[in-house]
Swiss-Prot record:
It is found in: Cytoplasm. It comes from Streptococcus pyogenes serotype M49 (strain NZ131). This is Ribosomal protein L11 methyltransferase. InterPro entries: Ribosomal_L11_MeTrfase_PrmA, Ribosomal_PrmA_MeTrfase, SAM-dependent_MTases_sf. S-adenosyl-L-methionine binds at T158, G179, D201, N244. Methylates ribosomal protein L11. One of its GO terms (biological process) is methylation. It catalyses: L-lysyl-[protein] + 3 S-adenosyl-L-methionine = N(6),N(6),N(6)-trimethyl-L-lysyl-[protein] + 3 S-adenosyl-L-homocysteine + 3 H(+).
Length: 317
């Protein structure tokens, strides 16, 4: 019987997506994320509130490696990468790393216990792919397989991106999703009525995972996934461009975004920690955008900019 090695990394919630990516890059075959915020005030599939859930800023990200993996080398690499993330200003908290060995059948089912359907916005609910879920009238369901990396749609940066998409999409738009990760924002855009979505990611794993998640959802053949370095080489104009990535990378795409966003179109930027907010604002303003909406959850910020000559309805207009 094949065995697997489990590594649990305990970090601050703000580092969820970055650390998940690190674990996949070190060879993990999947990750599971245990976050108390996903359970407080939520009901399980039987309609019962989760009992005795204590709020914490720390989460556990569990990764699974084949038995042939040299775990000592992996853990050393993880610690190096986490230290580098902290040096970039990302809050990782007091990191601890644990490991154990699992049988094949334990690995196959162990991580699924962490995930339940989650209502993210007024219209959008994210549902694990293996769960039978009866949607209510008007509810739009995004099916995701969170067995791979890039989060499950419950991180504050993703939630705010989804809120922003609900705010700006009215139907028939062209959307560009930069750094698509799991593909959740592209799937949401399709469900919210966008006509065509182009999803780009520099990471080949993300491109594959996004396509797999898109294939789980009906009516999403209007999403086109491809490898791409931000907006370099992209000529397709869009009504909406959305990017949920680190602030240091967001500032690199604002000029290209202004070139591609149609007049009266929108640029949605998320993944911005508060200490880097001014840097992102300055880059977007310099490119020519006007700020329409600023959302905040904890230390995270999301911004909705508009490309317009009519500044009467925008912040600072």
């Amino acid at each position: 019987m094949e065995t697997w090695q489990e590594v649990a990394v305990h970090v601050h919630r703000d580092a969820q997506e970055a650390v998940s990516h690190v674990l996949i890059e070190t060879g993990s075959q999947g990750v599971a994320i245990a976050d108390s915020a996903d359970y407080i005030g939520q009901k399980d599939r039987f309609g019962e509130l989760y009992p005795d859930v204590e709020q914490s800023d720390m989460i556990a990200i569990t990764a699974y490696y084949p038995s042939s993996t040299n775990l000592a080398d992996v853990i050393a690499t993880i610690n190096e990468q986490l230290a580098e993330l902290a040096s970039f200003g990302l809050q990782v908290g007091q990191v601890t790393v644990d490991s154990q060995e699992l049988a094949e059948e334990d690995w196959a089912d162990n991580w699924k216990k962490y995930y339940e359907p989650a209502r993210i916005t007024h219209d959008l609910t994210i549902v694990p792919s293996w769960t039978d879920y009866d949607a209510s009238a008007g509810e739009k369901v995004i099916k995701l397989d969170p067995g791979m990396a890039f989060g499950t749609g419950t991180h504050p940066t993703t939630k705010m991106s989804l809120f922003a998409l609900e705010q700006v999409l009215r139907g028939g738009e062209t959307v560009i999703d930069v750094g698509t990760g799991s593909g959740v924002l592209s799937i949401a855009s399709s469900l919210l009525g966008a006509k065509t979505i182009y999803a780009y990611d520099l990471d080949d794993v993300a491109v594959r995972v996004a396509q797999e998640n898109i294939d789980l959802n009906q009516g999403t053949d209007n999403i086109h996934v491809a490898a791409g370095d931000l907006l370099k080489g992209v000529s397709q104009e869009a009504d909406v461009i959305v990017a949920n990535i680190l602030a240091d990378i967001l500032v690199l795409l604002t000029d290209d975004a202004y070139r591609l966003v149609k007049k009266e179109g929108y640029l949605i930027l998320s993944g911005i920690i508060s200490e880097k907010l001014d840097m992102v604002l300055e880059a977007a303003f310099s490119a020519g955008f006007f700020l329409e909406t600023h959302m905040v959850q904890g230390e995270w910020n999301a911004l909705v900019f508009k490309k317009t000559d009519d500044i009467s309805g925008v912040i600072g207009g």
